[in-house]
Amino acid sequence: MKKALLMILDGYGISSTTHGNAVKNAKTPHLDNLMNNNPTIMLQASGEAVGLPKNQIGNSEVGHLNIGAGRIIYTGLSLINKEIENKKFFTNQALLNAIDHAKKNNSKLHILGLVSNGGVHSHINHIYAIMELANQHNVPAILHIFGDGRDVPPTQLLADLDQLIKKAETTKTKIGTISGRFYAMDRDQRWDRIDLAYNNLLSNTGKSFADLKTYVKDSYQQNITDEFIVPAYNNNYKSDEITIQDNDSVVFANFRPDRARQLSHYVFGSNYYDHHPQLRRKNLYFVIMMQYEGINPSAICYPPKIEKNTLGEVLKNANKKQLRIAETEKYAHVTFFFDGGVEVEYQNEDKVLVPSRKDVKTYDLAPEMSAAAIVDQLLKVYTKYDLTVLNFANPDMVGHTGNYEATLKGLEALDHEIGRLLADAKKNNITVFFTADHGNAEEMIDENNQKVTKHTTNVVPFSITDPNVKFTKKEGILANVAPTILKYLEIQIPEEMDQEPLI
């Protein structure tokens, strides 16, 4: 009866560069031995290999989703891009409902969203697609522009305006208002900011412009960049032609929830916040791109998809015992995200949350983090489980501080704990599957000697501590991990896992 342990090192990528590479330069004899003396290949952990757009850096959420699901999980940006490309977007029921509501009530369709190609909260192409859809159905559309300046250069909006204005003309869309994201997309309950943006949408109070480009240029003259553009309305139209009125449809084009939630609460109402605007329009049909926590709109374009037969569910159905263990910083990743982005409790499953250090503000001050406590707890219990899933946070969380020396220390402290774990696993005949969710600690100083704190697009290792295993490929993707473990444990791979085992 084989038993396995899946050890995920968060932010542990592989790069041939030596400069600024904490992974390569740390003294980690146990990890080196693990990779050099056991079957090892590399896995792609970024971009299209994990359901993100090409060349987009990986992240912990997406990484664990793909590892646990055994299939590529398409999220936010790439999911909607794909739908626009294959034209399914134009038959999306939530959007068609908004169109129908506007037609039935002889009213307007308002499009709210961050107008930028940053791809973090929204994408300008998604907004264009909604404008096209309204035009196809002869529904009057009003665009309310939120300036970015954070996920793109601070004055990118001006460069995008020619194309935007042209697109508005061809789709017969009126540009109604403009506001910097500082106001329209606040997430810290600074309601005075939301008030300015919201009142501008409802009743055209405050500043106005006759020419949008001039207004943006004038803002720049006053050192007000896209993010901070003061809410203003287009005075070429009567107020009720461009403001949100009773019976209108409203589509919020942002797919990321955190900065769309407060304005959505103002527009449509929710129980999420105690603070409410003085006025809300009646009988709105309010559509959001993806689920925003606490907001119950009329419809969601892409509601959360329940992934069937993730690794955890397959083990449960096979009556296998499983353990999930991580410190606080990454606990959600080995549970919620690993299970397909849902909270589930399986029978024969235990979850151990090891507290992250609270006595330090940043982890470069305690780069060992809680690795020792994780191993202490693990060694007491893990032999009774068929599969243990474990996350060590050090390479990622210390890597994010940009402190190279501390990251070396963190990796070396972690290696010591991994040494203890590997020795015990060997003694108990437990096979260790070792991988990472994305890169980070291997690129900490760039060629200009500047600190690098972000994730990378580098590959991650995949090692198995069984000399009898032979990999069938030289390289794979994160979604190959789950089917590989199932094959090793001689458990049938479900059809939902469309990625093949690598052994």
Curated annotation (Swiss-Prot):
A molecular function annotated in GO for this UniProt entry is: phosphoglycerate mutase activity
Query: Bound how, and how many: what does the cofactor note say?
Result: Binds 2 manganese ions per subunit.
Active site as annotated: 60 (phosphoserine intermediate)
Where does the chain bind Mn(2+) 1?
396, 400, 455
Record's function text: Catalyzes the interconversion of 2-phosphoglycerate and 3-phosphoglycerate.
Q: Which residues bind Mn(2+) 2?
A: 10, 60, 437-438
The catalysed reaction is: (2R)-2-phosphoglycerate = (2R)-3-phosphoglycerate
Q: What quaternary structure, including any partners, is listed in this protein's UniProt entry?
A: Monomer.
- Name its species: Mycoplasmoides gallisepticum (strain R(low / passage 15 / clone 2)) (Mycoplasma gallisepticum)
Q: Which family does it belong to?
A: Belongs to the BPG-independent phosphoglycerate mutase family.
Task: Show the disulfide pairing.
Answer: none
Q: What is this protein called?
A: 2,3-bisphosphoglycerate-independent phosphoglycerate mutase
Q: In which pathway does it act?
A: Carbohydrate degradation; glycolysis; pyruvate from D-glyceraldehyde 3-phosphate: step 3/5
